């Protein structure tokens, strides 16, 4: 129906559009010729060398997503809050894991990289009285799809981490699962089409109104709500995964097989 809003706020029907052909909605498929488990020979690349040179730790959480505008906990991918929780989870910890952020702000420029580092450092500065903190590394710049697959398959990358407020689908999360990479993320929104609580690690939280400063018409409008991850549960799930990653890796392999069959481009064709 076509509706028109009146001065008093009421909506009046002004017409209608009738469809004379059926509509089918396809799911978003993953290119499983690219996003799949890779062997050691397939991992040989400049990217692998660069990451291994940059990141010395052998246990690394990976995040892939754009660092959008907003204050602490307001960017849609929730990266600033995620960084703070990671630091808190493993502060003063012997042999801590690392966090690798594949992120950027508006673009891939030198200025953007500096601003991204500044926003990460702002969270680190909250722990000025802590003796030791885990390392956070920034991977800033454009990667090819083949390089992204290599990144998900690197042995030291143990899990994909996201504290997102909401996703239309969550493509990087889906692609990571197809590479058999365990996923730790919020248990709400589009990513639940291909994740579950048994074969992935889901973070608890609650729906809250989108901050007024983040309203983005016509994408995010009032009175929209999005998912806010519980900070305590983020910390618990990070520590839980660190202790149980071998068992959770086994579950991720099961999910990877399911998603490569169910969410591939070939499966889209059958729809």
What are these regions (language model features)?
Residues 182-185, 199-202:
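Short hydrophobic beta-strand element within catalytic cores of glycosyltransferases
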Residues 149, 174-178, 182, 189-193:
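Short alpha-helical segment that forms part of, or immediately flanks, the ligand-binding pocket
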Residues 30-147:
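Conserved catalytic-core segment of nucleotide-activated headgroup transferases in glycan assembly
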Residues 156-158, 180, 187:
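A short alpha->beta transition loop at the rim of the catalytic pocket in nucleotide-sugar-dependent
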Residues 1-46:
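Donor nucleotide-sugar binding/catalytic pocket of nucleotide-sugar-dependent glycosyltransferases
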Residues 206-247:
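C-terminal "capping" alpha-helix adjacent to the active site of nucleotide-linked donor transferases
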């Amino acid at each position: 129906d076509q509706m028109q809003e009146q001065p008093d706020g009421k909506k009046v029907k002004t017409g209608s559009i009738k469809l004379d052909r059926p509509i089918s909605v396809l799911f978003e498929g993953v290119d499983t010729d690219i996003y799949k488990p890779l062997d050691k020979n397939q991992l040989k690349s400049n990217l692998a060398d660069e990451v291994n040179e940059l990141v010395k730790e052998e246990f690394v959480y990976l995040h892939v997503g754009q660092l959008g505008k907003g204050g602490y906990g307001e960017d849609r991918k929730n990266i600033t809050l995620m960084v703070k929780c990671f630091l808190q989870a493993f502060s003063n910890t012997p042999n801590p894991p690392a966090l690798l952020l594949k992120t950027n702000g508006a673009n891939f420029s030198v200025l953007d990289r500096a601003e991204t580092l500044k926003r990460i450092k702002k969270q680190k500065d909250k722990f000025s009285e802590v003796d030791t903190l885990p390392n956070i590394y920034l991977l800033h710049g454009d990667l090819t799809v083949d390089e992204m697959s290599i990144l998900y398959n690197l042995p030291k990358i143990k899990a994909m981490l996201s504290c997102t407020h909401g996703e239309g689908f969550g493509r990087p999360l889906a692609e990571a699962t197809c590479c058999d990479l365990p996923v730790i993320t919020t248990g709400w929104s589009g990513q639940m089409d291909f994740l579950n609580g048994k074969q992935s690690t889901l973070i608890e939280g609650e729906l809250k109104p989108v901050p007024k400063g983040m309203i983005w018409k016509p994408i995010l409008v009032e009175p929209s709500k999005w998912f806010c991850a519980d900070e305590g549960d983020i910390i618990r799930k990070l520590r839980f995964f660190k202790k149980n990653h071998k068992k959770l890796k086994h579950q991720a392999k099961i999910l990877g097989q399911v998603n490569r069959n169910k969410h591939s481009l070939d499966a889209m064709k059958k729809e």
